[in-house]
From Swiss-Prot:
Changing residue 283 to M: In a colorectal cancer sample; somatic mutation. Residues 103-209 are annotated as: PBC-B. Its main location: nucleus. Residues 14-209 form the PBC domain. Belongs to the TALE/PBX homeobox family. This is Pre-B-cell leukemia transcription factor 4. GO terms for biological process: animal organ morphogenesis; brain development; embryonic organ development; eye development; neuron development; positive regulation of DNA-templated transcription. The keyword Hydrolase does not apply. SUPFAM superfamilies: Homeodomain-like (SSF46689). Residues 333-374 are annotated as: Disordered.
């Protein structure tokens, strides 16, 4: 008896894609060419199950996404960024915004940065030149920053709009993403403005610091002030008229002259020995000039001194103050070895005990060693 025929084998079941295969296909997307990606995207958009897929994605999003209804639409402005903007505007680096500020904007455009609108000194000219360089660098970098921010924002917006065709992306979410991008770029903007402010402050401290200006007197101004100081060493307190004259000769202000004399007196008291050589130079120069002008016929190389037995003061011509140095230098007897000049008489302003007058009675206005106060 013949055996029954065997049934035909059933066709193999279609192979189901597991998770690893799906992930492999997803990872392969990055290796696709642009034409392949466009073809796959077009096929997906035309697929009959695409609306169902989109509906499922919307349901999943409603269950998992965090509601954004309670989030503020706009964050408050950064206080530190506002302070930096105000500082850059005050220094003339930022351009004032064209809003309803009227005269304030006009004044900001006409005033010279740094609070020196009418000062044409070398320091301020150099300051304005370097400030202009800082301003150019700042605006160049700010323009690059703004361009990069615009390009990146446009790219992300286009990407989200394209993805919204496949997954639910609302316009509100796109706005939130743009705001997050601007927040990231704001840190770069703040760093740029902070660096610019530090550069301006460093420039101001180097070129507009009043203490530095006092140290940078010209050689002519220093010569004028030193000559007056050592020629009036027994009373180095110039009057207001003398200060005006010294300021005019040295190209300084009266305040600078007053400060210089105050500092000079302090330094002289602290280290008198150090200034003896300098005093000899200036007093010798002044004595020669005064002798040539006010004492015609006097050819002596050394100054004569009154004898200890003299009963009257050293004679003063009508020039008065012009011969004050001669009297000061002649107030002490020269050493036995012979010397033209003695050390300067010590007045009360120098902190030493005044020497009694030997050439005239106490209280005589012509006394050489009488104590003098300001």
């Amino acid at each position: 008896m013949a055996a029954p025929p065997r049934p035909a084998p059933s066709p193999p079941a279609p192979r189901r894609l597991d998770t690893s295969d799906v992930l492999q296909q997803i990872m392969a997307i990055t290796d696709q060419s642009l034409d392949e990606a466009q073809a796959r995207k077009h096929a997906l958009n035309c697929h009959r199950m695409k609306p169902a897929l989109f509906s499922v994605l919307c349901e999943i999003k409603e269950k998992t996404v965090v509601s954004i209804r309670g989030i503020q639409d706009e964050d408050p402005p950064d206080a530190q960024l506002l302070r930096l903007d105000n500082m850059l505007l005050a220094e003339g680096v930022c351009r004032p915004e064209k809003r309803g500020r009227g005269g304030a904007v006009a004044r900001a455009g006409t005033a010279t940065p740094g609070g020196c609108p009418n000062d044409n000194s070398i320091e301020h000219s150099d300051y304005r030149a370097k400030l202009s360089q800082i301003r150019q660098i700042y605006h160049s970098e700010l323009e690059k920053y703004e361009q990069a921010c615009r390009e990146f924002t446009t790219h992300v917006t286009n990407l989200l709009q394209e993805q919204s065709r496949m997954r639910p992306v609302s316009p509100k979410e796109i706005e939130r993403m743009v705001g997050a991008i601007h927040g990231k770029f704001s840190a770069i903007q703040m760093q740029l403005k902070q660096s610019t402010c530090e550069a301006v402050m460093t420039l101001r401290s180097r070129l507009l610091d009043a203490r530095r200006k006092r140290r940078n007197f010209s050689k002519q101004a220093t010569e004028v002030l030193n000559e007056y100081f050592y020629s009036h060493l027994n009373n180095p307190y110039p009057s207001e008229e003398a200060k005006e004259e010294l300021a005019r000769k040295g190209g300084l202000t009266i305040s600078q002259v007053s400060n210089w004399f105050g500092n000079k007196r302090i330094r002289y008291k602290k280290n008198m020995g150090k200034f003896q050589e300098e005093a000899t130079i200036y007093t010798g120069k002044t004595a020669v000039d005064t002798t040539e002008v006010g004492v015609p016929g006097n050819h002596a190389s050394c100054l004569s001194t009154p004898s200890s037995g003299s009963s009257g003061p050293f004679p003063l011509p009508s020039a008065g103050d012009a011969f004050l140095t001669l009297r000061t230098l002649a107030s002490l007897q020269p050493p036995p070895g012979g010397g033209c000049l003695q050390s300067q008489a010590q007045g009360s302003w120098q902190g030493a005990t005044p020497q009694p007058a030997t050439a005239s009675p106490a209280g005589d206005p012509g006394s050489i060693n009488s104590s003098t106060s300001n």
